[in-house]
Amino acid sequence: MKLCVALDLASRDENLAIARALKGLDIWLKVGLRSYLRDGANFLNELKKIDDFKIFVDLKIYDIPNTMADAAEVISNIGADMINLHASSGLRAMSEVMNRLANLREKPLVLAVSALTSFSDDEFYEVYNQNIDEAVLKMSQNAKNAGLDGMVCSVFESLAIKKECGTDFITLTPGIRPFKGNSDDQKRVANIVMAKQNLSDFIVVGRPIYKSFNPRETVEKILQEIL
């Protein structure tokens, strides 16, 4: 299991300060929509100059198939090590993205986003007219058939996805709260023990790290727990 630290702070300088504080640790960094729009593609280069971090660019690409493929190609060529697409875009769109990326010299890992962890069961049903478990398995099958590397999902769907798509099909699980505390705007949250039990390959942690008194110490503690 790998730790992916979410860089979701209010400014570029704050995000870079956290990255510098975590230099030398075996982690990935996640650059989300706010940071990418504000700080641009060069922000990835700045992060890699600090410590050659592996970077997950979390933009949840969702558009018509050709536009998705264009966007995925651009992001892949600026140094992303992992990107994601909305599984709701469907099999054809995801397949087109993977066909476009097939000839890249350095292709990133490509994951599909299933049900956002901010959704409650009722909220998901209101939007998709399906329960989460059934919908996520169907999305996962489509992602696997399209040639993607795995899924972004909650811990609660990870094991079922592994059983359906194989243990080598990656699950990246946000909404991880390693210590007791506020779940903030997440509904389907979990801890590290649950992530291990459900065979998560990556866990995403943000606020519990950068809101702590000593972020490096907090990350070191999390890394000990995921061994």
Curated annotation (Swiss-Prot):
Active site: 60 (proton donor)
Lineage of producing organism: Bacteria, Pseudomonadati, Campylobacterota, Epsilonproteobacteria, Campylobacterales
Keyword Lyase attached: yes
Enzyme class: lyase
Task performed by this protein: Catalyzes the decarboxylation of orotidine 5'-monophosphate (OMP) to uridine 5'-monophosphate (UMP).
Binding site for substrate: 8, 30, 58-67, 117, 177, 186, 206-207
Family note: Belongs to the OMP decarboxylase family. Type 1 subfamily.
Protein name in UniProt: Orotidine 5'-phosphate decarboxylase
InterPro entries per the UniProt record, alphabetical: Aldolase_TIM, OMPdecase, OMPdecase_AS, OMPdecase_bac, OMPdeCOase_dom, RibuloseP-bd_barrel
Matching SUPFAM superfamilies: Ribulose-phoshate binding barrel
Species in which this protein is naturally found: Campylobacter hominis (strain ATCC BAA-381 / DSM 21671 / CCUG 45161 / LMG 19568 / NCTC 13146 / CH001A)
